[in-house]
Amino acid sequence: MAKKQFTLVVVRHGQATHNLDTFQRKDMVLTENEEMPFMNSPLTELGQKQAAMVANRLSKTKFHLGVASDLCRAWDTAQAIVKANPSLEKVEECRLVRERNGGLFDGEHTLCYAQHTVEEAIEDRELLTWRIPNGESVVDLRVRVRAFLNDIQAKAAAIEVENPTILVATHYVWMHELYHVLAEMSLALRGEKRGKKPRTPNTGVDQYTLTTRCGEDGQHVLEQVVFDIISCGSHLDSVSTY
């Protein structure tokens, strides 16, 4: 069946209020009218400047599609990129790329770091089924990441360009898990084991070149994953990052 190669340019949001060392849970902003609310922190002034910097970095990239988390820190970062890029008129809302819901740990930097440290020690991430109270497990997040990959392969295949480029504006932990999932696929496909993902700064960029094939059942299957750029914040050289 027909193959399609496409590029994902994945961008973390600019600095948000919950990234500040002074942030407290009492300052938290949540999404409304949801059974499981998500933290919905706005960009700081620095975060807005960072968004403008990554927008300038990507201003000459020809995008054929853009998707973004609806959480305002990622959505507003995406809007800055749209404003600076003549090839991209808008981005589509995609809740699959929302940040992992940290539940009671959201805004608690020490607890989040401890949780991350424990989870990184487990090689088989499908074992990480424990949910943070009022939040998501790693496995819950991986379900969303895989659903996104299925969806974006279908969308890429439908774009009438040979090698389309797609913008994804999202979040730190989501990007971390996407890397894990793609690294596992790359290992299964080609026996190539990837190292640990470096820390991604605010507005840091990952770029992947993916090759997909549509099977006889109509389902898309990844055949190759190329890790082009990982955790790059070169556009932030003169700006403090979190």
What is each stretch, according to the model?
Residues 1-7, 100-112, 158-162, 179-242:
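Acidic, low-complexity terminal tails and accessory targeting/binding regions
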Residues 1-64, 79, 83, 87, ...:
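An N-terminal RHG(E/S)-centered segment typical of histidine phosphatases
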Residues 49-122, 195-206:
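Phosphate-coordination/substrate-recognition cap region in phosphate-metabolizing enzymes
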Residues 68-69, 143, 169-170:
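Short beta-strand scaffold positions
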Residues 60-62, 152-164:
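Glycine-rich phosphate-binding loop signature in dinucleotide/nucleotide-binding domains
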Residues 36-39, 120-140:
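Short glycine/proline- and acidic residue-enriched helix-loop micro-motifs
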Residues 7-11, 161-173:
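Beta-strand elements within well-structured catalytic alpha/beta cores of enzymes
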